[in-house]
Amino acid sequence: MTAKKTIDIVEKALEESKKLDRKFKENVDLVFNLKNIDMNLPKNRIDQEVILPHGRGKEAKVAIFASGELAIKSKKHVDLLIKPEEIEELSSNKKKFKKIADEHEFFIAEAPLMPTIGKSLGTVLGPRGKMPKPVPPNADVSGMVNNLRKTVKVRSKSTITFHTIAGSADMPKEQIAENIDTIVKRIEGILERGRLNIGSVYVKTTMGPSQRLI
């Protein structure tokens, strides 16, 4: 059950957002500040993917590297299909591929193509945290893509302050609040000391002021 406090904080953030006439659809962001933890140690860094129960508001874009039957089967479910013969072309046109990498949140790939992708395009995908997930044999590509469209990445790198998306400002406050509670619970669960490693958590719209949750 979603905490009433979370719903109240989301409501405040949305009310503040409405005071300002935005010309675009704002996201609702969740900002974490950790404490008593050494982020120079790789084991302490956050690198999680969380499926939001009510989605992101605006779905994440997904691209697939595939050939043959998988390419045919998956084309209608993804935003971009990259065939094996295109990998070499993209590796020699990094500017073009960087644009693709920035426009797509997730990449999946036919398993046999993974080594080629890593060798040819890994320098672009790796630093962005977007190396493809292999598609298992006989996988339900539609289900896999649908889950990714509702997924957010939570990455701290080496800093104690980091943020992620919890939804969009036009979603019902109860849905945003449940998304937030799902993310916070995940982060608490992987921190060595749980809630004791969290200094504060703020909720805000893209351009709006922060409202403290924790």
Which residue stretches match the model-derived regions?
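Translation machinery proteins
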Residues: 18-72, 89, 93-94
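Flexible, glycine/charged-enriched surface loops at secondary-structure junctions
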Residues: 23-28, 190-202
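Flexible glycine-/small-residue-rich
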Residues: 66, 166-168, 205-207
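Residue-level signature of catalytic and energy-coupling elements of molecular machines
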Residues: 74, 126, 203
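C-terminal edge-of-domain segments
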Residues: 202-214
